[in-house]
């Protein structure tokens, strides 16, 4: 079942993650989000992602939580959490959205969440920098078959496999429930 969002992407709590996009679709969508001569919108550059992680570290997030195992700060397969946010949404195995608080998640289960479903997954007001969906960036890899780069981790994998600092790759045609994007304004 396709769980692609039907809402306009926004930066706020309890929104559907904008997933099911290829890296080029993500850049097209991101660059068209702001219609202004004063601002530009784009996918995040890899260095911007790294600077956000460094900022979070200077504000008290442990380096190990960002670089080694992000299960304690993000939505991952191998962690336990309890969502009490009545305005949140969730999709077991990334399919079939349900509105309302999910309650307790069992260990080793895959549940896609709306943005900021838990304050635990919000660091300095930045939602879901670790886990939930991996995010396309403007980086390119050295692998010609997998030229597109994405950052962060996914709800269906472990926090020590794909921590917040992870830099992964994908094909130009890859899309799915586990990949989305984050917009930067400058």
Place the predicted regions along the sequence by residue:
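Surface-exposed recognition segments
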Residues: 121, 129-186
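Short aromatic-cysteine micro-motif
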Residues: 1-128, 186
């Amino acid at each position: 079942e396709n769980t692609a969002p039907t809402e306009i992407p926004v930066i706020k709590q309890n929104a559907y993650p904008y997933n099911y996009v290829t890296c080029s679709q993500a850049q097209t969508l991101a660059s068209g989000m702001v219609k202004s001569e004063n601002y530009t919108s784009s996918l995040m550059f890899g260095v911007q992602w790294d600077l956000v992680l460094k900022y979070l570290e200077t504000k008290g997030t442990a380096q190990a939580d960002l670089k080694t195992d992000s299960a304690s700060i993000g939505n991952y397969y191998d962690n336990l959490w309890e969502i009490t946010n009545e305005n949140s949404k969730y999709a077991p195995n990334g399919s079939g959205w349900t509105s309302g608080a999910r309650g307790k998640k069992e260990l080793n289960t895959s549940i896609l969440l709306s943005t900021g479903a838990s304050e635990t997954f919000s660091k300095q007001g930045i939602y879901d920098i670790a886990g939930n969906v991996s995010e396309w960036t403007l980086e390119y890899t050295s692998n010609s078959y997998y030229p597109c780069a994405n950052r962060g981790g996914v709800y269906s994998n472990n926090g020590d496999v794909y921590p917040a600092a992870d830099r992964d790759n994908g094909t130009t045609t890859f899309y799915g429930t586990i990949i989305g994007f984050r917009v930067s304004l400058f």
